[in-house]
Amino acid sequence: MKRKQHALNFALLLVSASLFFSGCKPTTEGEIGDPFDKVQGMMGTWELSSFTQQDLNSPVKETRDLSAFFIDGVSTPIQLTFHEDRTYAVAIETGKNYFGEGGTWGFDDDLYPTFLELYSPADTLSYNLGGMVREFDQSMRIEYRRECGSAATNIYTFEFNRING
């Protein structure tokens, strides 16, 4: 008899708990809306605001700010301009050019991009996106992972500000 009572109490407890937790769900009102157009988010001219390097082989894993190699307060920092026809241009006065001479650009997936890909007659360059850029965002971060063989050795992080769009 006690076993039946324990089983009944346990079943009642389970039903009560499930009703309690199912009653706590908030109701969703409205619609989420259409996703942002990632291609439109890239349009415009972007100027370098920060450049950092992380040495993956160092036991400290520190990140060094090397912005001074590109930003000297006199010359215009590197600028990338992305056009609607999927072409891009690079303007650089000082520092090393990690982006080629210009060409065409794209994403690995236009709906859910992970990589920015730059195509030129000489090379194809691929950069990790540090976050997706929407049309109203004013900053963009991309990462270039330098490899030796199959192992990554450095991560260069470029942060840009939109100067027109």
Q: What kind of feature is each model-predicted range?
A:
Residues 25-100, 110-165:
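Lipid interaction determinants
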Residues 103-105:
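Short beta-strand-centered aromatic/proline hotspots
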Residues 20-23:
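C-terminal motif of bacterial Sec signal peptides marking the signal peptidase cleavage site
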Residues 2-11:
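Bacterial N-terminal signal peptides that target proteins for export
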